[in-house]
Amino acid sequence: MSGPGGANDIIARTVQRVIQQRKLVDAPLAIVSKVGAGGVLGWSYLNQHAGDGGYISISPINLLTEHILGASPLTYTDVTPIAQLFNEYVAFVVRADSPLRSGRDILDKLRSDSGALSFAVAASLGGANHIAAVLAMKNAGIDVKKLKFVVFTSGVQSQTAVMGGHVDVAAVPVSGVVPQVEAGRLRVLAVSSAQRLGGAFASVPTWKEQGVGSVFSSWRGVIGPKGMSAPQVAYWENVMARVVESDDWKKDIATNFWESNFMTSAESRKFLQAQYAEYKSVLIEVGLAR
């Protein structure tokens, strides 16, 4: 789903490391990177091995959004959901000397003029960071069709644009902003989680605390190819349950400010169905989907 060093690659290697260290499967695990087309190449490769329990993949929200946007013929109903692993939240950051001091300041500015501020998002409209911003503003009663978004290829570029004064606000994964926040170059005005995060974000209020009933996570799960048998699904479901119970995994969860949110295969399917409907509604509202 992503190249070496990308978010999904890192997650896949973390899962691989825990499985191998704890000897949770009998055979060695190999990472195969299939990069491009927003994840479509990876899911297509997965389905070339239909019914084969030897192939699994990390699944990000792109599995849903690329289909909603019309960029992918495949979605969660075309593969086999195995488990959900964790939630990753989005931080809304500004330059350290920005006159915007809170999430409420963002909302007040946009309520008077929906196009008054520019938002940096990566890596595409319709992606996790974009949806997080749209949902928060929508729930605050702001006309999301008039919001200004500037798309960058990475969260690092989004942060650089904010620090350079080229964009007012960046919506970025929380784990990626810690270095610039601790260096005093960026301030976090809100996070998209239901409750406050710890560590560097302990003093940062959620959108809910600032009067906006918006919670959003860029989750990660595990899928297999279409046509997997019930025993194959149960096997990998059990492996993933043991992964998330390990101390190594819990350490990675804490380090990256992720929130463990394990779901079984059946629970994952229901979750993905609900998420698909929510994302489709949002993307239709901003004119990116029908």
Model-identified regions with their sequence ranges:
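Short coil/turn segments
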Residues: 3-5, 61, 95-100, 122-127, ...
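C-terminal lobe and pocket-closing loops
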Residues: 176-247, 274-277
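N-terminal (or domain-start) structured segment
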Residues: 1-78, 125, 142-168, 262-263, ...
